[in-house]
Amino acid sequence: PLGDAVHRRMMRDFRLYMLVGGMPKAVAEYIKTNNLGAVDLVKRDIVSLYEEDFWKLDNTGRATALYDAIPAQLSKNASRYQIASAIPGERAERVAGIVKMMNNFMSANVAYHSNDPNVGLALTMDNERFKIYASDTGMFVTLAFKDKDFTDNIIYEKLLNDKLSANLGYVYENVIAQMLR
């Protein structure tokens, strides 16, 4: 047993990691400025670059819509990513290639359902039932609070200090998915 003080410090450091993430530019900005607002701006620039790349690879905008909807999808606590709620009228089989591309480019982590996890995943993987996670937990936090100008420092501070009243299970789910990749 490490004691409560050490546990609190380790959890705070872990939450700081969840906020900053592991993108080299975001980490460098935090080390340089110790300012979560500056880090958020760096991560927003990275999100914009991802979205530009998605448009180059898929000019329909579906990849961008799928990526931007990751936080909303995870917060629903559903067993799979619901394509039609991210892109009205769309179906999983029609975006399978886009989802695979996002996974291969490591901009997102895709966890496919398996019909029988006791045998090789490739044999039982269900390409139409999956969850999509952000590849970086810091990017996920920026996506989740993207609707606000500089993800109000209040949100960052509350999340860092474990004082945010929202259920953050989906943030932890994303960070665990990142760790398992």
Question: Where are the regions that the model predicts?
Answer:
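Accessory nucleic acid-recognition modules appended to NTPase machines
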Residues: L16, M23, V27-R181
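Amphipathic alpha-helical segments of the small helical/lid subdomains adjacent to P-loop NTPase cores
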Residues: P1-G22
